[in-house]
Amino acid sequence: MGKFYYSNRRLACWAAGKNPHLGGSVEQWLAAINTDSSFRQTVKEDVQDNREQPTAIRMFSWKVGFGPIDNPEKCDWHFVLTGERPAQPTRPVKADEVVVVPQLKKVVIPSPPPPPAVYFRAVGAFAPTRSGFIRATVERLSREREESRAAALFAELPLEYPQGAPLKLSLAMKFAMLKHTTWRKWYDTSDERLSEAHPGGPCLPPPPPIQNPPFFQERVREFCRMKSCARAFALETSLGLNRAWVGLVDIPSTSVCCADGRTTGGQTIAQEADPLQHRVSTSVAPGRAQWISERRQALRRREQANSLQGLAAQTDMTFEQARNAYLGAADMIEQGLPLLPPLRSAYAPRGLWRGPSTRANYTLDFRLNGIPTGTNTLEILYNPVSEEEMEEYRDRGMSAVVIDALEIAINPFGMPGNPTDLTVVATYGHERDMTRAFIGSASTFLGNGLARAIFFPGLQYSQEEPRRESIIRLYVASTNATVDTDSVLAAISVGTLRQHVGSMHYRTVASTVHQAQVQGTTLRATMMGNTVVVSPEGSLVTGTPEARVEIGGGSSIRMVGPLQWESVEEPGQTFSIRSRSRSVRIDRNVDLPQLEAEPRLSSTVRGLAGRGVVYIPKDCQANRYLGTLNIRDMISDFKGVQYEKWITAGLVMPTFKIVIRLPANAFTGLTWVMSFDAYNRITSRITTSADPVYTLSVPHWLIHHKLGTFSCEIDYGELCGHAMWFKSTTFESPKLHFTCLTGNNKELAADWQAVVELYAELEEASSFLGKPTLVFDPGVFNGKFQFLTCPPIFFDLTAVTALKSAGLTLGQVPMVGTTKVYNLNSALVSCVLGMGGTIRGRVHICAPIFYSIVLWVVSEWNGTTMDWNELFKYPGVYVEEDGSFEVKIRSPYHRTPARLLAGQSQRDMSSLNFYAIAGPIAPSGETARLPIVVQIDEIVRPDLALPSFEDDYFVWVDFSEFTLDKEELEIGSRFFDFTSSTCRVIMGENPFAAMIACHGLHSGVLDLKLQWSLNTDFGKSSGSVTVTKLVGDKATGLDGPSQVFAIQKLEGVTDLLIGNFAGANPNTHFSLYSRWMAIKLDQAKSIKVLRVLCKPRPGFSFYGRTSFPV
């Protein structure tokens, strides 16, 4: 069986051939594979599972382009199914041709469709749903008919009033025009096509008659009658221009599609019916709107002037004083202001026209009627952008719409203090999974008055979206509503800030709105999660509601096996918002900078950022190297949304979630190690095999085959302490190494693979450095460990009681041959001379399911005890199913030393001993040993000895055997390692040096002390030691202060700042612009030993946990 070659067409043919019951052509299957990468992977895995079938071999063993089915015009399905090739013809093929006489094609004329039945459904003037023929009729109204109606309406109105007097009409005349224009707008019965499409005519009431305009004498009489109450008349007139008919919609279980919008940016369910705003054509609307606006302003100014004159007369104030008081009150904070800022403040100018490509704020208003509880949750399908607006900006070259902000305002009706709760949930309408579709929710009590919520979804969708009527899906529900079913619960308004963008356009959100999204505060509101909820301060109902929204079920297609699907009925979902996850009530007078904004994202499982595969051999043995995945390459190669966000942000400090999907199998006994190597410290030590001392010295996680799919989180800010750039850098390269810790006892049937998924939410980091991983202090060790795992311990299958030990000299540096492997745990323990207390840890039995053992864990000093009567008197513990244990360290000194002396062994001191009380046992034929892995978590109530070194100098490095008199030692802004070709270098070993080795970056100030001894007599020596501080490099750098010490002085003191322009310096030599120091010797051969000592000042910080093999 040779190599298989895959292509989308071959996979589509395979899927179509295996599923004839599902139907569909090869091209349809090919389209599904081209658009769905996960489906393609599923089909590919099915082919790999059936690669021994002859059909699979005939389809996939050919190189792409040479197979029997690669050419869609000449598919040799006979060969694929039977393996038989057609026999070669024995005579010319021309003899087998059959000449067909062309026939005239018969044209079939289809019969006309039957006429539709008479439509007798009663439709109100402003029903929440409109019939199809009504909508079609309204849309077919031509521009000429609109203009003629507008001209007829204006002909009935006076064209101008002298001296800017406001327009005054009788109420009868206004209502006549209202009824007439509303009827003509929505029900144009003059269209003869209605009668043709619906025999008998539409079932509509007759239009109201148009009243003739009154004579001049009647107008004068009406004006004189109303002059006595001019203020009330002016108020009525102003309200008449805005008067809207509001329908009470009884829709507790009705889906309402609001798919179009005309003047407000989106069609309302309860449509405002102002004739002066709706019965105009697009050509005359701007001038007429200005005409109406001027008259409204004049009317308001006159009304205000009358009110101020009355106020001044009643309070003995001047007119100016009354006006100042009125304006001062108007500048105060208004109750119920919208949270959405004005458009001019929300978007920066873009393009040559110096204006944002966006439209109005409010796009949906409706009245909630009935009790939306239980399964009667109100569902509203809502498109925030009208069709006209889409067409307008499509002509300008825009291709997408971005919903930057969405506001929900709930204005409840009823008695104050009513504890009835009401919740509105906003979701993305084209996403079936509620956890992914959720945008935000707002909950309030009806008795608490107006409440507002604002969300920043950043939702972007194409203008070519075929189902634009359901972009936003709103769910409205209550858990304890008790009002009458015909009562109006609340008025709910939904508004958006949006913009239209093209393929070459950036989003142009103003800095104030961007700051509101980042900091989570806007217009005296508090951000909690990704929702801003504002409720009045001092409400009658205390606390916050606990919402429960029932979302109805439906049918769907579900995969039940490889290339197999079935249609199922899904039950409804319950979407609950607990009170602790909502915004709290706030005082509107609180100063916002004093409020602490919660992070917008509280979880990292948002979307897939990267994906990789680890291949595992069928005979995977211990210490086998399986592969390496570069986290940066996983994200960049995946090219998903997170990678685009990463490119935009540049620097990120994410929390990765790793999910390793593998089939569970308890018969192999396999255990792997996933090692996080952020600084390439162990990469070179891993080839075809990997010693566990290397892989367990860096942050790592154990993966057990018997448990199946594994997941963990990698907090990059916690483990590395610095941000991550979207392109590769010289000082860090985060990788995941996969190695086998304990091999499988049974060889599997074939090699296999595990899929590694990387989830993250990549948001911009505000700085390069985060919280330090460690801050140096002589007493930094507190008894807690992280990632402390001992190499595997193996028990032989024997009847003799076995004993295995794990040493407790945890400050000892592990070794692989002659290589020391510095890790942070041993560096921390080496800060003290010894320790005592109770060790808490866990034992992992990594054997197959048919192995078993009974383990007794005990601590002993200087050897082992094989006397059972004495052994069971020691404080110990049996290893239970979860493997956890707590054992007190036994020592005649109450402590055990942190490190060993030369010639000593682990058993000479305190150790953890594991006795196989019973077992191990296994079925006949098994010869492999039983492995266990021990992890130590902490020392409970530690009894720590004296510090190894208190506040004193550490030996850094010794220079000796100089070969040149003119010697210059360049000491960069790093500490741990140093080499030279002109002298001998010996590095000092101490806890501080080990901490430098076990971190990727470090920064702080070191006090340095230089000491040297001479080869010649003291009186005959000459020369000097010069210490110079510099910045940059030798060629273009800066020279700083310098100190010169006579060689007879034998010592000198200085300091060195460890760090670079970024703040912390990696363990590399002159890699970044930083400070460094040069030590110049003019008589180096006369110096026997030059010793440099260092003492870190308080606050010396380390970033990025790792290890250092040397």
UniProtKB/Swiss-Prot annotation:
Key word Ribonucleoprotein present: no
Keywords on record: Capsid protein, Host cell junction, Host cytoplasm, Host nucleus, Transport, Viral movement protein, Virion
Post-translational modification as stated in the protein's UniProt record: Specific enzymatic cleavages in vivo by the P1 encoded 3C-like protease yield mature proteins.
Keyword Repeat applies: no
Protein name: RNA2 polyprotein
A biological process term (GO) from this entry: transport of virus in host, cell to cell
A single GO cellular-component term on record: host cell plasmodesma
Database matches in InterPro entries: Nepo_coat, Nepo_coat_C, Nepo_coat_N, Nepovirus_subgr_A_2A, Viral_coat
Family note: Belongs to the nepoviruses RNA2 polyprotein family.
GO MF, one annotated term: structural molecule activity
Gene3D superfamilies for the chain: 2.60.120.20
Annotated SUPFAM superfamilies: Positive stranded ssRNA viruses
Location in or out of the cell: Host cell junction, Host plasmodesma
Note: Virions are comprised of 60 copies of the coat protein.
Family matches, as Pfam families: NeA_P2, Nepo_coat, Nepo_coat_C, Nepo_coat_N
